[in-house]
């Protein structure tokens, strides 16, 4: 039987972790939980979700009462596509903090990704009925609407952005849309960030991804170039840019051009 990739969420103390944007991060066990939370947040903001997962987990080794770290840990598992593991760890967290609304939201999102919409809906509705609604809870509610092809997703995601002005909210909303292949909607959310943060290389990378999926090859190349100009060691942008240049054509873009002429 295959061993799950993040079954135990334990990492070696002396492990070097590459950020993909600068020099490797040396994991130092002498740092406290607040340091690792800050590291997790910084890595999350530039799309290094596996590093962020490691740092959330590291912070919990120091203080298992950090609900923010439990929530972040499950969110990163979801973004890494580890949906069964996300369910497992959200349930473990809820054993420690029963009925915490953000932890209920993490389980709801994991259940949604697995395809159990009934359970996902029950969990997120329960979370939203409690005090202290958060942007994340509304993002999960919005994701459930997207997954079920309902038309209230925009309301939910707009509500999330009202509750939090953090640029991470529209960027991670874009990741939700990308997961469900709603590329134009993802592009719109990234665009909101770029209006205020034109120097965000992660936003440029996501914009390039959206444009590539929409068949806007020339625009995607420009976006990836801008990402690399701002962050020369951005490996994912380099790979995507190379693929676009070497591929020479994109079937989605080809059909778009044909239909424009007809």
Model features per residue range: what roles?
Residues 45, 79-80, 113-114, 146-148, ...:
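Register position in tetratricopeptide repeats
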Residues 30, 64, 98, 132, ...:
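Short coil turns that delineate tetratricopeptide repeat
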């Amino acid at each position: 039987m295959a061993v799950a990739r993040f079954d135990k969420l334990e990492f070696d103390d002396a492990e070097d972790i590459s950020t993909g944007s600068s020099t490797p991060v040396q994991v130092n066990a002498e740092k406290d939980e607040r340091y690792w939370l800050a590291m997790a947040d910084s890595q999350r903001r530039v799309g290094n979700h596996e590093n962020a997962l490691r740092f959330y987990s590291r912070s919990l080794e120091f203080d298992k009462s950090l609900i923010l770290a439990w929530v972040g840990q499950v969110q990163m598992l979801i973004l890494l596509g580890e949906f069964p593991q996300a369910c497992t760890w959200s349930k473990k967290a809820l054993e420690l903090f029963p009925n915490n609304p953000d932890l209920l939201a993490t389980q709801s999102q994991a259940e949604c990704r697995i395809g159990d919409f009934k359970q996902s809906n029950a969990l997120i509705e329960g979370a939203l009925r409690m005090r202290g609604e958060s942007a994340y809870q509304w993002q999960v509610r919005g994701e459930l609407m997207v997954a079920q092809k309902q038309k209230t997703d925009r309301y939910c995601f707009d509500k999330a952005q009202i509750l939090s002005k953090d640029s991470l909210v529209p960027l991670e909303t874009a990741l939700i849309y990308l997961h469900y292949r709603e590329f134009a909607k993802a592009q719109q959310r990234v665009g909101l960030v770029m209006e205020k943060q034109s120097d965000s290389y992660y936003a440029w990378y996501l914009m390039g991804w959206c444009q590539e999926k929409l068949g806007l090859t020339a625009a995607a190349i420009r976006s990836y170039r801008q990402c690399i100009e701002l962050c020369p060691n951005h490996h994912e942008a380099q790979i995507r840019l190379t693929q676009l240049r070497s591929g020479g054509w994109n079937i989605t873009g080809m059909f778009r051009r044909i239909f424009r002429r007809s």
